[in-house]
């Protein structure tokens, strides 16, 4: 959606619309990533899956790590966490 979830992946504009067509290159070197708006997923924020399912339908805090496991706090599988779900920023 022209929106970048991870500012250090080649998009200086961050999630404010300066990303154009997305980051493209992925987010391998990033440790944290935030989807600021609904539908703000791109290849720069591959964490928007699991209990969120595809591109985020609700604003979430994401983890960019490839492998994730349940954090054991009711979030279910995957690494997308509702803001009200866990105290931790990332569960993986």
Curated annotation (Swiss-Prot):
Keyword flag Lipid biosynthesis: no
Superkingdom: Eukaryota
A GO CC term assigned to this protein in UniProt: intermediate filament
Record's keyword terms, sorted: Keratin, Repeat
Renumbered residue ranges of the record's region 11 X 2 AA repeats of CG: 4-72
Similarity remark: Belongs to the KRTAP type 28 family.
Note: Human have a similar number of genes as other primates despite the relative hairlessness of humans.
Function in brief: In the hair cortex, hair keratin intermediate filaments are embedded in an interfilamentous matrix, consisting of hair keratin-associated proteins (KRTAP), which are essential for the formation of a rigid and resistant hair shaft through their extensive disulfide bond cross-linking with abundant cysteine residues of hair keratins. The matrix proteins include the high-sulfur and high-glycine-tyrosine keratins.
The protein's name: Small cysteine and glycine repeat-containing protein 9
The gene coding this protein: SCYGR9
């Amino acid at each position: 959606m022209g929106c970048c979830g991870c500012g250090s992946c080649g998009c200086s504009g961050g999630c404010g619309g300066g990303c154009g067509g997305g980051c493209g290159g992925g987010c391998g070197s990033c440790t944290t990533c935030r989807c600021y708006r609904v539908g703000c997923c791109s290849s720069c924020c591959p964490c928007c899956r699991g209990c969120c399912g595809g591109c985020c339908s609700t604003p979430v805090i994401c983890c960019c790590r490839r492998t994730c496991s349940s954090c054991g706090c009711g979030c279910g599988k995957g690494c997308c966490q509702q803001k009200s779900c866990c105290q931790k920023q990332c569960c993986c």
